[in-house]
């Protein structure tokens, strides 16, 4: 059963992580124009940056979930050393428990191509039948996740040394997406027209957010946005984060920008009485906000080493808070 649980955990991670058919930058031809939300991550680019390498190592060290995943997929890691190069996930809507329907691509090398055999071996060891099925002439794997009501389906594409897993919670979509990857014809969906800046590690886009359930409130905040796009990365030792929202009301974009500027100014005034806020406001001078032609743009560029220092501080403080919390519980138990 431990191996079966590991496969379920692996399937759950794939839902969260997503993946790309072509190593970054994103190949828009692999994402249909019907995709209302898209997320793309270039793990190779991330591992080459100060911040990305730290976060990948931290996830590897701290994630208890990896212990279960590795029962089914030995050596699994999100770092490129595990064979994964990049990730893309997209869909049309979100429900309360996440994407209602999604397609994900995981791009990598021959190491991830071995996952199928590893899944079968783990199932046999757990006393279960092979998870393989056939759909429209393609070999696919069906893996039930822990809630028992959902099955994740996946098929493997190979071209030279490259491997791509096509994953979905809909069996038919797995076959359709695999054919789409092979033939192309997409435009990038919600990331259509958003250029891949050198050094980009991750991009996310939402098209018509008012029609994507979990983005309703966000859309109201930025003036009934028609689209939201953002990217983060690191280039030549500089961390950057950029976001753009195209609104329905061109005249309102400048007003929204002024409101955001006002929040930054308010933070500057309040920081003298709040050490935590003061620490964050050290970076405020690197934040630029503008509104023009119906678009609100927010950009942040700062020395990557200093940003990494802040991330490490916050991580250490979070671990310290957890230790204090559990230590307090233990003390209470000793008093009883």
Residue ranges of model-derived segments:
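Broad, structure-driven detector of short, well-ordered beta-strand segments within folded domains
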Residues: 85-92, 150-158, 220, 226-234
